[in-house]
Swiss-Prot record:
Belongs to the class-II aminoacyl-tRNA synthetase family. ProS type 1 subfamily. GO terms for molecular function: aminoacyl-tRNA deacylase activity; ATP binding; proline-tRNA ligase activity. This is Proline--tRNA ligase. It comes from Sulfurihydrogenibium sp. (strain YO3AOP1). Catalyzes the attachment of proline to tRNA(Pro) in a two-step reaction: proline is first activated by ATP to form Pro-AMP and then transferred to the acceptor end of tRNA(Pro). As ProRS can inadvertently accommodate and process non-cognate amino acids such as alanine and cysteine, to avoid such errors it has two additional distinct editing activities against alanine. One activity is designated as 'pretransfer' editing and involves the tRNA(Pro)-independent hydrolysis of activated Ala-AMP.
Amino acid sequence: MLASKFFMPTLKENPSDAVVPSHIYLVRGGFIRSLSAGIYEYLPLGLKVLRKIENIIRKHMDDSGALEVLLPILTPAELWKETGRWHVYGKELFRLKDRKDAEFALGPTHEETITDLVRKNVRSYKDLPLNFYQIQTKFRDEARPRYGLIRGREFIMKDGYSFDVSEEDAKKTYEVMKEAYHKIFKELGLDYLMVEADVGAIGGKFSHEFVVKVPSGEAHIVYCEKCGYAANVEAAKFHHHKLPPEEPKPIEKVYTPDIKSVEDVANFLNVPLTKLVKTLIYKIDDKDFVAVLIRGDRELNETKLANLFKAIDVRMATKEELESLGIPEGFVGPIGLNLPIYADFSLKELYNIVVGANEKDYHYINANIDRDFKVSGFYDLATAKEGDPCPVCHLPLKETTGLEVGHIFLLGTKYSESMKAYFVDKDGKEKSIIMGCYGIGVSRLISAIVEQYHDDKGIIWPENLAPFNVHILVLNPKDQESLNVGFDIYKKLKEKGLDVLLDERDESAGAKFKDADLIGIPHRIVIGKALKEGKVEYQKRDGSIKELVDVKLIINKLMDGYHG
């Protein structure tokens, strides 16, 4: 491809709304352009990269036995109402009506659509197993689309769905998909972690995320360097060290004037934070109030709380709601509280604790569970953090940020039961199909790759993902010999099967080098002043090679260094 004929609108300045490297370089390099908030156009360079990523995904999905389909983007509301997700998704779901007032959604995922397809066509165990996937545009009305392709309102996703006769078979399929995902992300050259994850609005029995390690990532991960345990903080567990037992002391109400925060109470009473217990009042699905107890040095994990109640939404009670319950803000405690009380595991063997007295300016000291108040049970409700003991080997956990690029779920019968997707087994009994679902953020992968492959000048594409294999720069296209040599090398490399970009534009050498660094093609041949001595310069974008090579040897030299 000749640069003079190619559409590559590079920019000298960073976009005003771009803060992460991938957003900056993909826009500046002419890979993408924003049409509206969270909606992007893929220009020729960007589309070439996208297609290469899609082909790698297709290869491994096909090799795993999955079958490619293409489902409608527009899905009838009736299907979403069958599973209850019409209401669960809330404002994130794009909804519309046709001219007959029939309701539809623009699909953010396709569990309902694929389950409808299967229930209409599967009757017997002989029709199973099935494993489908598609690569398709999805829609989600994000409240705050940001970071370019990382969080958009329109995005490209690989979503897959498996259907099995038993949970045992479904787990085997899940493992096959898990291995396929490992192969995909390794071929993409990503430094990633597979972590335990929360099932979220998709639902199901368990799930894993594939998270690319980047500083700008929105996913917070804890992991163990020793045993390999890793989990999203929303789902992460940790080992609870047992505190030494104590003899219960007499409970006592103490005056704590206008002291509300746990840190201030601990300092005022001269006790460690581990002796304080926070009593948090939450509203579940905007209906019922509950009290949640957590140790003073820990933070409540709202995702774990929502999962405990199988709730769509949990939120802390407002000051007005606390007043309506007769509870003063800042002094909430479990004693005499007329609400169900749920405690974190960390309180199970905690004695002589400090709690609010449900009275302004007062706390109780030496309160004890069972003697002074009852709880409905002990649950894993705390957020794991760096330094907590690993739940497997008990060594300290580490914390990092990352970008979720893949998510797999064992759904069980969540969708098949609600949508009546049944099959008849060998014994003639009707049973629900066991499902799994498997997603990859295809367009997000472009950003993830750039986040890990860039420097202060631009992108450094891996060889198998670069929009072109080789970039030839003719620094002085007005010199006929330089132009002839450039075209000769261009022709020979194309005959070798390489995809080559020849920059023969009438631009300054500086502009060409800046564009070349920005778009990040891994191999570069520079035709400049050294041609007078019969040499051209061979460079690798990552800076590992920069040397003069005889013109007659440049093809062999490049082919020796090419591994795409």
